[in-house]
Swiss-Prot record:
Pathway: Amino-acid biosynthesis; L-histidine biosynthesis; L-histidine from 5-phospho-alpha-D-ribose 1-diphosphate: step 4/9. Its EC number is 5.3.1.16. Belongs to the HisA/HisF family. The keyword Lipid metabolism does not apply. The active site is at 8 (proton acceptor), 129 (proton donor). This is 1-(5-phosphoribosyl)-5-[(5-phosphoribosylamino)methylideneamino] imidazole-4-carboxamide isomerase. NCBIfam families: 1-(5-phosphoribosyl)-5-[(5-phosphoribosylamino)methylideneamino]imidazole-4-carboxamide isomerase. One of its GO terms (cellular component) is cytoplasm.
């Protein structure tokens, strides 16, 4: 199972949000590149980067920082936030991002999604962010009327191979992920599922591994040191 440390970018800094609320941010590192290098040194194989400003604006807003991270580390990087066009996808790939995460565009622009899947296949990951079972978009500011299960089924039909599922109410809370929703998702689709939001302990990670999750994204727990990245990597590797 892949372990992905999270770096959320806002105004060029590394921050954490609470339940997706932009007015509840905590700056965890003024220097995202340095943070990326710390995660690499601790043994991470892949980084998960979200351009929070971009998610709201609908276009990349921290591109230079993402490029600097890609240049500074040798491990792979997946990134998203505000990716709504083919040129935006190609820009991220050109600066060294290995996998591009789509969110809002996957729900609202199906022809675009189909085109990028045709062109880039498994390099495209779709992030499904849900609140009370329904999908949220535009940096979690807008709620839709489609359930996370229905969107996952649609993504599978289009040819998406990997999704990131986040229960927004759990994000940044250290209360554990939504195991029930993740289990239901796994029963309904054959996609590779990366779990995100609320992961707080080694026990959470072990339970996700027992559920055969493809990966897990860890953010706040690493910054607040309630989890040790090296220990998590060691335990998941030995299982």
């Amino acid at each position: 199972m892949e372990i992905l440390p999270a770096i959320d970018l806002k105004e060029g800094r590394c921050v954490r949000l609470y339940q997706g609320e932009f007015n509840k941010e905590t700056v965890v590192n003024e220097h995202p590149v340095a943070q990326a290098m710390i995660f690499e040194k601790m043994g991470a194989n892949r980084l998960h980067i979200v351009d929070l400003d971009g998610a709201v604006l609908g276009k990349s807003a921290n591109l230079s920082t993402i490029e600097d991270i890609c240049k500074a580390v040798r491990i792979s990087v997946q990134a998203g936030g505000g990716i709504r066009s083919l040129s935006a996808v190609e820009m991220l790939l050109s600066i060294g991002v290995e996998k591009v995460i789509l969110g809002t565009a996957a729900l609202h622009n199906r022809s675009f999604l189909e085109e990028v899947i045709r062109l880039y296949g498994e390099k495209i990951i779709v992030g499904i962010d849900a609140k009370n079972g329904y999908v949220a978009t535009r940096g979690w500011l807008d709620m839709s009327e489609i359930s996370y299960i229905e969107l996952a089924k649609q993504m599978e039909a289009v040819g998406v191979q990997t999704i990131i599922f986040t229960d927004i109410s759990k994000d940044g809370t250290l209360m554990g992920p939504n195991f029930a929703q993740l289990q239901l998702l796994q029963e309904e689709v054959s996609l590779r599922i990366i779990a995100s939001g609320g992961i707080s302990s080694l026990q959470d990670v072990e339970q996700l591994q027992a559920m055969n999750m493809y990966g897990v994204i860890i953010g706040k727990a690493l910054y607040e040191k309630t989890m040790d990245l090296q220990e998590v990597l060691r335990v998941t590797k030995s299982c």
